[in-house]
Curated annotation (Swiss-Prot):
It comes from the Bacteria. Its EC number is 3.6.1.1. Residues 74-130, 252-310 form the CBS domain. Keywords: CBS domain, Hydrolase, Manganese, Metal-binding, Nucleotide-binding, Repeat. It comes from Clostridium perfringens (strain 13 / Type A). This is Cobalt-dependent inorganic pyrophosphatase.
């Protein structure tokens, strides 16, 4: 498995989550050898896209899970066999590479079958079928290679040999009893036998013992269009070896193949292997092309993926499969929740307005100047998370760091913020689902599940005609997720307050937390701009009180 570190923000990523991951990846790549890859767990918001576009930075790649996939394994990178390859060549390859089976693929590398040692041995151990070369359409090239033979005369019109294999170990006058037209005859150096076989119109004459037929025999073969080859092996050895010239597609397993995909989870492949008994399994990619094979030992010698979490520490907000990964670091500015790691980690949690402030501090504490792009991303994220220093979560450190980064990025925070918020708060063309889920976070407080979404907008009134439809969606989401209460904050940065919409089984939780009375499931909360500092704490207090009663 490639040794990399994934740096990820939370699900439904906001600007701080995306920008902190990108910038921290730059920091890690400047301070360590192991490559750090920034990733995201959801779509990029309009606001975040504005920041990325302004500084010419690509969005991080999407990461579905950190559970191990087949593509993460050190699989055997073995070129599949072509279907026409001889058993002899296949056996040599498998012996040299210590393989018990090998994939067979067509010219486009699409899987045709699997050739195993048991397929090959069965060909030898089964009752001899003298017509096997005809049935398998064995080529002359395979026969020449297998017998280390040389061609003395070739019938170019005949691609395969239709008859049975016969060792001509009898008198010339007895040949008619055993030889039919089109047969493959193995003979020694007796000219009268060779001539009689040609007259009987065999399709292939194999002369053994390293003997070269006379000119008269060759001329007779040319006249009758008979292919003649010579081999250094004796007749017994030639008859024993010739079966090795069969093409692998004749003996390979074609039906009920069990292949795995590079995108399959290792845990699912383990189940597949427990239910089957193959020694190796072909691996195919998204284009159905063979890329290698794996065996059971590949699943045993696996390593966990390495992850650094930024802007979150709750498992429910993190990447799928986190429990199967190795968390190396957590950089966050939220409450400490249900983190649990197998080893000691670098855990940095500070009560600041933005995780990006902490990431920026990491640069300067280590004497590293962030690039213009990284500085711009961090600056934009701080502006976003602190609502241009208006959020109660904002600290003097956030303001100082933002202005320091702005100098490197070559922007004026106030001017940049105006355009950024304008781009980010537009709800035009968005569906109810897109609006709500753009920045939605679930929380579990004393066993009670709640969810809070937040949308920054400069036009709360323009949204209100959608209120009924939004509340219906919120109730559906609360029921499907088992949430006791669900809330949407429509935050007006300019007027410094939030209109809240509340749904779920227990909307009174919000009323008690904010000491308000909901009218038609909504009310305005003056001065409330921060979900983290002004919404989650009062919700936590009320729920804790209710549970303890």
């Amino acid at each position: 498995m490639k040794d990399v570190i994934y740096i990820t923000g939370h699900k439904n990523p906001d600007s701080d989550s995306i920008c902190a991951a990108l910038a921290y990846a730059e920091f890690k790549n400047k301070t360590q050898d192991t490559p750090a890859i920034p990733v995201r767990l959801g779509n990029v918001s309009q606001e975040t896209q504005y920041i990325l576009d302004y500084f010419g930075v690509e969005a991080p790649q999407f990461l579905e899970t950190v559970k191990l996939k087949v593509e993460d394994l050190e699989m055997d990178k073995i070129a599949p066999l072509a279907p026409e390859v001889s058993l002899k060549m296949a056996w040599n390859i498998m012996r040299d590479k210590n393989l018990k089976s090998i994939p067979v693929a067509d010219g486009n590398n699409h899987l045709l079958g699997m050739l195993s040692t048991s397929n090959i041995t069965a060909t030898y151990m089964d009752i001899w079928d003298s017509n096997i070369l005809a049935k398998s359409a064995t080529s002359l090239d395979n026969i020449l290679d297998t017998l280390s033979a040389e061609a003395q005369n070739i019938n170019e019109e005949r691609k395969v040999f239709p008859g049975k294999v016969v060792v001509a170990a009898m008198q010339a006058e007895s040949l008619k009893e055993f030889i039919s037209e089109g047969d493959i005859a193995i003979a020694g150096d007796r000219a009268e036998i060779q001539a009689e076989l040609i007259e009987l119109k065999v399709s292939l004459l194999i002369v053994t013992g390293g003997h070269t037929p006379s000119k008269e025999i060759i001329e007779l073969a040319k006249k009758n269009n008979i292919t003649v080859i010579t081999t250094p092996h004796d007749s017994f050895t030639a008859s024993r070896l010739i079966v090795q010239s069969l093409p692998v597609d004749y003996v390979m397993t074609k039906d009920n193949l069990v292949a795995v995909s590079t995108d399959d989870l290792v845990e699912d492949v383990k189940v597949t292997m427990s239910e089957t008994r193959y020694s190796n399994y072909p691996v195919i990619d998204e284009n159905n092309k063979v890329v290698g094979s794996i065996a059971r030992f590949h699943l045993i010698s696996t390593h966990k993926k390495k992850v650094i979490q930024v802007d979150h520490n709750e498992r429910g907000q993190s990447v799928h499969g986190l429990e199967d990964a190795e968390v190396l670091e957590i950089i966050d500015h939220h409450r400490v929740a249900d983190i649990q790691t197998g080893n000691p980690i670098y855990f940095r949690n500070e009560p600041l307005g933005s995780t990006s402030t902490i990431v920026a501090k990491r640069f300067f504490e280590n004497g590293i100047r962030p690039s213009r792009e990284a500085a711009g991303l961090l600056c934009g994220a701080i502006i976003s998370d602190t609502l241009l220093f208006k959020s109660p979560t904002c600290t003097p450190q956030d303001v100082k760091m933002c202005r320091k980064l702005a100098e490197i990025a070559g922007i004026v925070p106030e001017t940049f913020a105006k355009e950024m918020f304008k781009a980010g708060t537009s709800l035009k063309g968005k569906s109810i689902e897109e609006i709500f889920n753009a920045d939605f976070k679930p929380f579990t407080i004393e066993g009670v599940k709640v969810g809070v979404a937040q949308v920054n907008t400069m036009d709360i009134e323009g949204f209100m005609p959608l209120k009924g439809e939004m509340l219906d969606y919120m109730n559906q989401k609360a029921e499907s997720m088992g949430l006791e209460m669900i809330m949407l904050l429509l935050t007006d940065i300019i007027n410094e307050g939030s209109q809240i919409l509340v749904a779920g089984r227990s909307p009174e939780i919000a009323e008690e937390a904010f000491k308000v009375k909901l009218e038609d499931s909504t009310t305005f909360l003056p001065g409330v701009l921060s979900r983290k500092k002004q919404v989650v704490p009062p919700l936590t207090q009320i729920i804790t009180t209710r549970v303890s009663k």
